[in-house]
């Protein structure tokens, strides 16, 4: 495949046929002739932005021993390389074919997701190129196939503080909508009896991906209310934020009446009380803020 895919023109009855172009790309790429490692590289890269990702970062996220297969795909013209900026990417049309052919699911892309998840969890550390990481997270959210909703919900929840930290406030509302969407999917699925699958990444020390059940916990519901309340601050809707914080606190207090508090639930309840106090301060209700 040539580097400049925009020069390919396919016509049927003198009219441009988008479907024909995709069909020709499928034949040219011949994914069935690639080895499994190369297919996995395409599967993961298809989730990342077409603007490009650093080649060294991609190697680290996939825990590749070498870039041999990546370089071969570059030589074939399937992957585009910007040698000046040291980035790699897929052309948008090739990305579309790669997604359709390799089916990038949460489970199959767990190694890369674990590394990005760990970056989101490192709240106290500044990472290199945070904008690149955020663009990767946005692209993944657009293209990932959700075969493991329980893990991906946790991943989305942990993305919020990362975007908030680097002040990408424009994306926060979309991220909250995505969180709620996944929660609704899990609710619609009912209580699943699917067999658990666990993927460990001993080399990276990143979290396990475990498929349990489509169960929405009190923590999930309270955290969604917390994030929704935070979105109200720029609009100065402090009273609505206070209502959401109170509802979230009630959820967690009821949860603790029948369940032993763990680190997650205890920390969340503490943060909710702090955030409620902050909302009262913005509302200039100093007595309630104490």
Predicted regions and their residues:
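Structural motif corresponding to the intra-repeat A-B loop/turn of tetratricopeptide repeats
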Residues: 166-169, 235, 283
